[in-house]
Each structure stands twice: as C-alpha cells, then as structure tokens.
Design a protein with these regions (language model features):
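Conserved catalytic-core motifs of GNAT/GCN5-like acyltransferases
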Residues: 112-115, 127, 132-148
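Conserved acetyl-CoA-binding loop-helix of GNAT-fold acetyltransferases
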Residues: 82, 88-101, 120, 124-128
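Acetyl-CoA-dependent GNAT
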Residues: 4-85, 96-98, 102, 106, ...
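Positions that flank functional sites
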Residues: 42, 118, 141
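Conserved hydrophobic/aromatic "anchor" residues
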Residues: 31, 64, 86, 125, ...
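Acyl-donor (CoA/ACP) binding surface of acyl/acetyltransferases
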Residues: 89, 93, 137-138, 146-148, ...
Length: 158
C-alpha cells in the first residue's frame, strides 16, 4: 500500500479483510455505540450505491469516509473518521476531498451530511471545503444531541 494515499475499498482487494477490521476498530472507538455502523457495516458496504475511501499511513488505516448516493442527484457522507493520533495532519480533508471528487464524477448535484454542532473541528473542516449549514435537526443523535444538516452543491469549487 502507498503511504498517505486515499484508496477506494474494493471487495476484490487482497487488503479488504484487514481494512474492514481496522475501519471497524476506528468506528467503535470514535462513535458512540448507538451511532456506530459496526453491526450493519457489511450491509452498508454491500449496498449498490455506496462507497468507502480510506487513507493508509504508518502501517495502518488512519481514517476513512463512507458515502452513498441514494439518487442520481444526491450523495450523503455517512461517516468521516480519523484516528486521534492522525488528526490535524490533513487526512480528514484529503478523504473528504476524494469523496467529493468521486461524487462529482457521478454528476451528483448535492452532497449532504449531518454533524454534531459540538464537534467544531469537523464543522470547520466541512465549512472550509464549502459545505453550508442548512438547518439544525433537533434530537438527531439522541434526545439531548442535535445535528447540523450541511450541504455542498456540485458547482462549488473544492
């Protein structure tokens, strides 16, 4: 594997089992149990219109972005996660840029996502890449946790 390069996860890849295992570890560590896709991960990846990009560095998966395109016009970033020790090194931005590029090749008109307003580094990253806050969705994650719904239109320069 190339160091620090964003790679698309493919089931046919020899690295598939190792990458999935590492992504699952990241998922369980970063996201609360009720937000984790760990139980439905294979189901999510098995969907026809979904993808996962990951970044490999220092002999491990440093982070990943998962997305889907439920229609020909809309894509949804479902997860973006970077291991704590690899944060603030540009990996999250590289993953997000790669996902945006992938969506644009499919002529997606809008990319949306949800983010906890208290996760200001994530909110700032999304804003840096042109995402705009559409609305506040109350009780999105839990009774006491809201989310910003954010979007990026395809005509935005990234």
């Amino acid at each position: 594997m190339d160091e620090g390069v964003v790679v698309e996860l493919k089931k046919s890849s020899a690295d598939y089992p190792m990458v999935v295992e590492e992504v699952m570890r990241i998922e369980k560590k970063i996201f609360p149990k009720h937000e984790s896709l760990s139980r439905s991960f294979d189901e999510e990846l098995g969907k026809k219109n979904s993808g996962l990009l990951y970044i490999y560095t220092s002999g491990e998966v440093a982070g990943y972005v998962m997305f889907s395109w439920p229609s020909s016009l809309l894509a949804v970033i479902t997860k973006l996660a970077v291991k704590e020790k690899h944060r603030r090194q540009g990996y999250g931005e590289a993953l997000l840029r790669a996902a945006i590029k992938k969506c644009k090749t499919r002529n997606i008109q809008r990319i949306s996502l949800h983010v906890d307003p208290s996760r200001s580094p994530a909110v700032n990253l999304y804003k840096k890449l042109g995402f705009r806050i559409d609305s506040l969705v109350e009780k999105y994650y839990a009774a006491d946790r809201d989310a910003y719904r954010m979007y990026l239109d395809s005509d935005a320069d990234v």
